[in-house]
Amino acid sequence: MDPFEFLECSICSEEVIDFAAIFSSNKKFGDKACKHNFCVSCLTYLMEYNTRNKKALCCPICREEFDGFIQNKTSSDLLKQARKLSSAQIFLKNENSKLNEEINLIKNERENEAIQYRDRIKQLEDSKSKQVQESTNIKSRIKEMENEIQSLEQARLLDLQNNQSKFDTQQQQILTLTQSYRESQSNYNDSNLRANELNNQIQKLYREIEGFKQHAQQQDNYIKDIDSEKQLLQQQLSTIEQSYDRKQSDLLNNTRLKDLQIAKLSDANQQLGTSLSKIEAECEHFKKLYKEIQEDANGGYQKNKNLESAIASLNIELSRSKSVIDSLNTNKRTLEKELEEMKLLYQFGRGTSISSSIAPPTIINTANKITNSSYNLINNSIGYFMGSKNYLNDITKPYKGFKIEEKRGNKTSQIHKVSIGNGCGHFVIKLIPTVSGTNVGNSYSKFIYNSIYSSTLAESEILLFREAMLLYKLNHNNILKLESITKDESSGKYYSVLSPFVPKDLEFILAENSQNFGGLGKISPTTLTFSDIKYIVYQLISVVHYLHTQDLVHRDLKPTSILLFDDYQIKLCSFGNAISVFTNFGNSITQPTYSNPSSYSYLSPEYICSVLDKENHSKLSNEIDWKAFDMWSIGCIFLELIYKKKLFNNLNLDNNNNNNNNNNNNNNNNNNNNNNNNNNNNNNNNNNNNNNNNNNNIESNFNNVNNSQQQQLYSVLNNISTYKESAPKNGNLYFKENHNIIIKSKVERDFNGANLPTDAYNLLCALLSFNPTTRIKANQAAFHKFFKDEPYYIHDSASVSPNKLEDLSSLLTDRNIKQFLKEKCSNLIQV
């Protein structure tokens, strides 16, 4: 049905396109009675016809007279728009109906899926309830077994205590008898006869003791048979997937056999107690004999002495018998420990992977062959008989207990932010990497392979855990603490778990607080005030002083090694190159590695010269004072805090960065800017020429440069030489006395135009002395007068120096790493 049917022309009955509205001069207020619609063409023809025939103008329908008409364009436009909207409405209705049909179809599908999910959830809940019931039954059974073992152990201990008390009483009686026999000197002939009879009885007792030893040997063989049966049980585990029902019954029988074996050991202990009772009876018999001899003997000093020897021999044999009893008890405890290890296997299987290195190695070798489905079957069977027991260890934690929240680094240098539990307690886990250039392996993949398939570390691999040992043993407020060591079983990687988590480092703070104005080297005012710089440097010197008092050197001090809280309290990290000064530095393993060129800016000149001097490298590297090396690095950091930029940087890298910046400006700016950039490039080229001339003077004292690392070190050394007031003419910078490296006026000019305090300038010069023998020591810098007016300054040297009882220097050498792993990580790492 057309919704615009009522708009047809009353004359031609066609659709009205152009509306014509009639009007009458005597009806000016819209009170005309005619309400019909006319199109312009029809009404025009009607008026022309009536006018030509001189007829009155009137509506052909209602005959109402009118004087004329007007063409209503507004009504025509509204009609066109209404028709368009009507078509759109019809189209949208059709689309809406289609969408409703699709929605209903999707809704029906979702309802069907929801029904299926509810059925599946119900099935899972039923299965869960069954498993919970089975677990409850298993736990109750395990509890009963543990109570039974505990009661047997208590009874055994009580019997041993009673036997020991009786034995002590008998020994006292024997001593009393011996004293009585010393007083007896009569009836020598009769006592001789009695003594011979006693010797025969002692020989008989010796034979009984030998039989007892054979019985003990049989017990040892019996225990070995138990071990072989346990190994047979482990071999049977590898085929449990094909014969689940049969193996489940075998496990039940073997476990019961273990209980019977423990019961047999208890019976053996009782038999030993019976044997001990027999020996006590023999002692009572000897006591009676002694009384008879005391009554009848009239002498015989020599025979009495023989009797004393016999009594002493008897005491020795009794002690040996007691040792045999203790040995059997030890074997029993060994069997109980093996039973606990099997319990641990069950407990560990419920919480983490079967191949975890905290499980016993003999069990892991068998369990590594078992598939996941087989392991589920083993859990269901072993779990019925064995409970769980927390494996006591000092610092190792399971890797799955940590939730990784943020990842940083690459394959060989990974640092992750992690949390435990419900997200509380943030820590940092750091990858323990391989040592480049050692016989650990040619690639990291080889190390991972060895870590996954073998929990035993080679001697060279043990050094990888030097940083972990140091962070665990060091105790200072400004050093990160090692909380635990963990292992990712999926990749075989070891991680150090460190605390606390500090979100920022000094390099980030320097980047935040520096701004360059037009390349002029002027530093804008920042939130990092001079008092904040002073506080940071004091903490850094204090923690290095602590390390040096423990005869430990860091060897990698740089802004990224210094973590900062919001109140500028620091935490020192990156102990990968740290080492004891008692170490033999002639070994290549003990030499520091600086793979990142950003570290070159903080290397001391004597170390750079030792690297560049290839002929005397080994000799010079052994003569380096690494404590002075750390103090130079502190001076570089102090100077960078003042300038907000690196001063002893790689000139080649800086120039490349400047040229790249200029090229970018050329592409983005107008011709005027291009001219300015060309001028800057010319200036940079002039500076490069000057630097190259200085570098040639230094390079002439060494061999030719062969690699990019040496080129960068030459550039850093050249930068240091050009910055100081009076540089030596050759590369042996550490053999020459020099003037101050820092020009105070230059520092003050760049330091926001402020006056640098004299004490700060003196400390900078002392830290950045070219001669390491005259460079300030950590204990001197910690009490420098630059810090004396600050509230955190400690005036008493005894308060800063470590307590003598806390001297750790002998515990921080490389030879202690293996002992550290044995004591703290024995269930994770085998050494």
UniProtKB/Swiss-Prot annotation:
Ordered alphabetically, the record's keywords are: ATP-binding, Coiled coil, Metal-binding, Nucleotide-binding, Zinc, Zinc-finger
Q: Name one GO biological process term.
A: intracellular signal transduction
Q: Which residues form a coiled coil?
A: 83-348
Establish whether keyword Kinase is in the entry: no
Please report the stretch or stretches of sequence annotated as the Protein kinase domain. Answer: 414-787
Report whether Nucleotide-binding shows up as a keyword of the record.
Answer: yes
Region span, Disordered = 657-703
Q: Which GO terms describe its cellular component?
A: cytoplasm; nucleus
User: Which InterPro entries does the UniProt entry name for this protein?
Assistant: CDK, Kinase-like_dom_sf, Prot_kinase_dom, Znf_RING, Znf_RING/FYVE/PHD, Znf_RING_CS
- Disulphide bonds annotated for this chain are none
Query: GO MF annotations for this entry?
Result: ATP binding; protein serine/threonine kinase activity; zinc ion binding
Q: Origin, by domain of life? A: Eukaryota
Zinc fingers, RING-type class: 9-63
Entry's CDD domains?
Answer: RING-HC_CeBARD1-like (cd23143)
Q: What is known of its domains?
A: The protein kinase domain is predicted to be catalytically inactive.
User: What family does this belong to?
Assistant: Belongs to the protein kinase superfamily. CMGC Ser/Thr protein kinase family.
| Protein name according to UniProt | Probable inactive serine/threonine-protein kinase DDB_G0274613
Q: Please tell me the species this chain comes from.
A: Dictyostelium discoideum
Lineage, uppermost ranks: Eukaryota, Amoebozoa, Evosea, Eumycetozoa, Dictyostelia
